[in-house]
């Protein structure tokens, strides 16, 4: 959750919300929009060594997949980190190509005429599926998650073995809220390693608008128990129905996400 104090500290008091959530100085800054990446599918790619869990195609790099029948937290995190490194590099490169081409063939002259000559350019990256990934990693860490494979050895489903419900994002529980916050920081650090078009400043949002439905439709079963094709929680929200401790606990979980990242 953003506060006026956070916004003023970051960009000053002469600000407006551009696009959906980005605070920017009016007339002094602009944004190269960047949509978002599907972090939940990235986790599944990490488990399957870059193969798509729905089509079986080799989409990501052919890293070593998880081979055990039970997901090990440290093993999954190491593979997930490698896959996020690849994703961040691919994401920034794609954004640079898009906005170079956009400026070349459809430069927004009228809107730029209303800005200062020397402006701050930002490039807006984003994450979708944060609560799905946080809950999945929480289940792997605090319960036992069994892998179910198809006849080709592809991990296509998961079974959680637990005496109770593993910690779930949205309930003011440090065990899972910390995982979510660390993911935001970690992915942003990876994004910042890669230079941007026109030296734009890297920014990141945990925003989906309505793409949480579309992204979920294209994502298979996840280790948190979410079913294939099911929508993600919108934006930085908990997954549907998992915030069982009231709205304040849900807000406190979201507020743990670092605004500076």
Regions found by a protein language model. Give the residues of each.
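Conserved catalytic cores of very large enzyme subunits
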Residues: 1-261
């Amino acid at each position: 959750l953003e506060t006026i104090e956070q916004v003023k500290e970051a960009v000053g008091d002469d600000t407006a919300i551009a696009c959906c959530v980005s605070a920017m100085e009016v007339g002094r800054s602009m944004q190269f929009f960047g949509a978002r990446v599907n972090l939940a599918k990235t986790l599944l790619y990490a488990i399957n060594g870059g193969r798509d869990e729905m089509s079986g195609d080799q989409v990501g790099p052919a890293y070593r997949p998880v081979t055990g029948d039970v997901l090990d937290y440290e093993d999954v995190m190491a593979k997930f980190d490698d896959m996020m490194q690849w994703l961040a590099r691919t994401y920034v490169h794609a954004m640079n190509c898009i906005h170079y081409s956009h400026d070349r063939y459809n430069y927004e002259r009228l809107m730029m005429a209303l800005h200062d000559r020397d402006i701050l350019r930002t490039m807006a990256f984003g994450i979708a599926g944060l609560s799905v990934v946080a809950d999945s990693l929480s289940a792997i860490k605090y319960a036992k998650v069994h892998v179910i494979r198809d006849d080709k050895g592809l991990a296509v489903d998961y079974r959680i073995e637990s005496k109770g419900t593993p910690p779930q994002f949205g309930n003011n529980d440090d065990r899972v809220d910390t995982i979510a916050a660390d993911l935001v920081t970690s992915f942003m650090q990876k994004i910042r390693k890669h230079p941007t078009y026109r030296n734009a400043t890297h920014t990141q949002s945990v925003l989906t608008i309505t793409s949480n439905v579309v992204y979920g439709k294209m994502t298979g079963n996840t280790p948190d128990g979410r079913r294939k094709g099911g929508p993600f929680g919108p934006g930085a929200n908990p997954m549907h129905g998992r915030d069982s401790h009231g709205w304040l606990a849900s807000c406190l979980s979201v507020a743990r996400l670092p605004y500076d990242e």
